[in-house]
Amino acid sequence: MKRFSIIAIILLVASLSVKAQRTDFQKSEWQKSGTTHRVAKKAASLDDTMPFGYGSTTNWGTLGIGSTGVTFDVAIFVPGGLQATINGFNLPVIDTGMKNVSVWLRSSLTGENLAEKSVSGPFVADEYMTVAFDEPVTLPAEGLYAGYTFTCSTAYPIAIGGEMTSGGLYLNYSTSTYSSGWGDYSDQFAPSTLQVLLGNIALSDYQMEFSYLNAPTLAINTAYEIPVGFVSNSANDINDLDIAVNINGQIENKHITLASPIKSGAFQKGEFTFDGISPAQAGRYDVNIALKKINGVDYEGEAQTTGLMKNLTRIVPRQTVIEEFTGTGCGYCPRGWVGMEYMKANYPESFVGIAFHKYNSSDPMYYENYPTLGLTGAPGCVIDRKAEADPYYGFGNDNLGIVDAFNLMNQELPEVDVKVAAQWNDDMTAVDIAADIEFLIAPESLSLIYVLTADSLTSTATSWKQSNYYYQFTAAQVDNGPGLVDFCKNGKYGKSSVKLTFNDVVIGSSYLSSIRNDGQTITSEDGYEAGSIYHATYSIPASTKAWAKSAAKNGHVDISVMVEDNFTGYIMNARKVRVELPAAVIPVPSHNGTTNQTARYNAAGQAIATPQRGLNIIRMADGSVKKVMIK
């Protein structure tokens, strides 16, 4: 059975400034592809109006929370900057039994209605229903929200479609006992297919607003191209622009010739890029652009936008963390097991897997003191604490889509470099950890999180068997999903409960409770600059469980050190290494009275003559490398 719900999707082409919200909304299968959705006959008052919206009119999907009898509010943002009125709506109909339907306009999502119209049926599925306001409403310069409210009779009653875009989808829902509150889901789902009908449009010769500026994260002295989006409401075609670029007070004028002319009309979208060389000093730089001319004519309005460029001392690899919510009692969790095992096998240098077993307390690997990270069901995962995903399907419905989700998140350049060494103490009652955190840009506020995980965990005991619902399905019913077919009928794991070998299982951490992390915190007040290194040490007590002790003695325990941004909650970078056994930390041996150490380096790779506090990297005469921590 293929998974048809998306928990959250976040595009990371540009750095995000707020933490992604968790959501109860789910998307059903896209069943209406290739259909041009019919528009009911317009009222006379809607003649000569122009539809505006973000969603597709040819490919609809449906969204809901999987329950009926729910009251939904759905809205889009209609930008200002255009002299026009809103005369009515094209209301997309999925649920023919919906009740208490109204359309409305508001200056804020929680504000009073500027205009409202009740709507009665009959409602025809897969059609736009046109609704006219009694009087046109003037579109204000600051824009407004256009939406509709209804009580559903189907589980997935909201029409969505097209490419995700800012302003495209705002949602609220309520039941008799609960209200979700408004949320911006524009970067998690396709936009609403709702349209407003604009009338009395008066275009200026030239009118433009910037919609985005994707300032990059990059190394010092590096060439860049920055994309800028805009919306034109101009009576003339646009061929070229003149802009002033201000980076941290340094202003440069640039002439931009558009790759394709922007046609005259309302809400015409375009994009251009401008290039340059990043500053020679690491830091955070405001990038502001202001529009000066269009087609050589001085621009009389005001159009500008700002982004933040992060300039790093150097580029280092990112290790991306996938934290999975799972448990032996979860019948659909075999797909999470398949996805995590695939990532571990195929991305050993960049994947940090952490499986926290909290689904059922009867699970021998159950670990209480770990945050659920907003995940409400298993299997589920969070990638770098930025985006929720399915640990097999990722952000969509594709087999092993977790790979694409991981690669997308792994593209972002980290602001810190992390080097780690860890060892069991002599009696193996605790793991001693040393981490060197190099700041590639001056830190603002961050925390360190330490997590012990164990590999190769298995047992023939009944309590260790993994529940499996997929044994009821054929391979075709899971779209012949690699690895997943093994749990289906006639597969090697095609039984209701199966023996597995579990990896990346949490057995200890710096969390003293599910919400309290005991790891170190570093802020801007500590005085660290770009290029400086924070030396951290930490100790985690060993698990008292027999199976965890066995994993430790067999050398199957890893330590992951994560650096979390305290403002966003995102993981900035991480490093996962194997915990060395006590014998690995004895003094460097010598042969025939001669040491086999040939060189010693600090965490930054600089040669040092004597041991220094923190992580020391020792190169041996035989070419091997050892990591030693000095407290």
Predicted regions and their residues:
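C-terminal tail/sorting-segment detector
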Residues: R3, A20, L615-K631
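Short, conserved sequence motifs used for protein processing/export or organelle targeting and
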Residues: E349-P582
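Intrinsically disordered, low-complexity Pro/Gly/Ser/Thr-rich segments with frequent PxxP/GP/PP motifs
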Residues: I251-P279
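Short, solvent-exposed loop/linker segments at the N-terminal edge
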Residues: P216-T222, W424-M428
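Short, well-structured beta-strand segments enriched in hydrophobic/aromatic residues
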Residues: M129-S166, R284-L291, S445-A454
